[in-house]
């Protein structure tokens, strides 16, 4: 059987000499892995993580790993390799997708979200965009946070907390008696114009980290590329 789609290469590992297994996040078919062969400089350039490709997957049976053929559409390597903030954000993003999405599970809308994020990242690293990516990833995996209004009073002002139980924002008045048990809601997530302080970066990463750990990172397992991104971001403010 054949699968033809557009995709982003999110992993590549050696199988034997000049032969690799690539994992591709495709628009209409989710994650697919296939065997590719590299016999030229051109093919080595094509099979790089982050490349957008035309993807052809062929196998006798659907459950087989299959062979893959790819044609390059766009490469981001040159945009990320010389900028650590961009590179670490990129590595974190594709590692999270590889970790949290199941093979052959469609995420077509999120695929478009990823392409838009990579385009923006190629131009400029933005911490707000990165956190919004993690929030979107949580939502895509079934754990959406509602930060638009207070989960109790429904007011839309003075929101400074997030309930770890309901994943909803809470106003100052509602949350004050329980503040030691609540997560902080970074101000920049409520306004596109606000400057982002180091403390707000810590709050934002603690917010998404809590829900990743509670629902998705089992047995306290962490994504190494994400940890590298966090350490770099908090130490290079």
UniProtKB/Swiss-Prot annotation:
Q: A GO CC term?
A: bacterial nucleoid
UniProt entry tagged with the keyword Translocase: no
Q: Which NCBIfam families match?
A: reco
* Record-given protein name: DNA repair protein RecO
**Known role:** Involved in DNA repair and RecF pathway recombination.
Record's InterPro entries?
ARFGAP/RecO, DNA_rep/recomb_RecO_N, NA-bd_OB-fold, RecO, RecO_C
Please state the span of the N-terminal signal peptide per the UniProt entry: none
**What is one process in the GO biological process aspect for this record?**
double-strand break repair
**Which terms are listed as keywords in the entry?**
DNA damage, DNA recombination, DNA repair
Q: Can you tell me which family this protein belongs to?
A: Belongs to the RecO family.
What single Pfam family name could you report for this chain, choosing any that match?
RecO_N
Claim: Magnesium is one of the keywords in the record: no
Q: Which Gene3D superfamilies match?
A: Nucleic acid-binding proteins (2.40.50.140), Recombination protein O, C-terminal domain (1.20.1440.120)
Out of the domains of life, which is the source? Answer: Bacteria
């Amino acid at each position: 059987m054949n699968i033809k789609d557009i995709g982003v290469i999110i992993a590549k590992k050696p199988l034997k000499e000049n032969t690799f297994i690539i994992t591709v996040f495709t628009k209409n078919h989710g994650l697919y892995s296939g065997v590719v062969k590299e016999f030229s400089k051109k093919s080595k350039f094509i099979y790089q993580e982050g490349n957008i490709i035309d993807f052809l997957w062929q196998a006798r049976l659907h459950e087989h790993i299959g062979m893959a053929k790819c044609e390059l559409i766009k490469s981001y390597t040159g945009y990320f390799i010389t900028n650590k903030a961009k590179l670490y954000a990129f590595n974190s993003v594709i590692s999270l997708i590889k970790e949290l999405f199941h093979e052959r599970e469609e995420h077509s809308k999120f695929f478009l979200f990823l392409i838009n994020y990579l385009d923006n990242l190629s131009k400029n690293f933005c911490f707000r965009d990165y956190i919004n990516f993690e929030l979107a990833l949580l939502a895509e995996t079934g754990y959406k946070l509602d930060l638009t209004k207070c989960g109790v009073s429904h007011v839309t002002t003075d929101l400074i907390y997030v309930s770890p139980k309901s994943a909803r924002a809470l106003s100052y008045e509602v949350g004050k008696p329980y503040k030691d048990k609540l997560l902080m809601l970074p101000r920049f997530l409520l306004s596109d114009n606000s400057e982002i302080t180091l403390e707000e970066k810590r709050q934002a990463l603690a917010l998404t980290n809590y829900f990743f750990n509670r629902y998705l990172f089992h047995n306290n397992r962490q994504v190494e590329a994400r940890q590298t991104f966090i350490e770099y971001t908090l130490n290079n403010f």
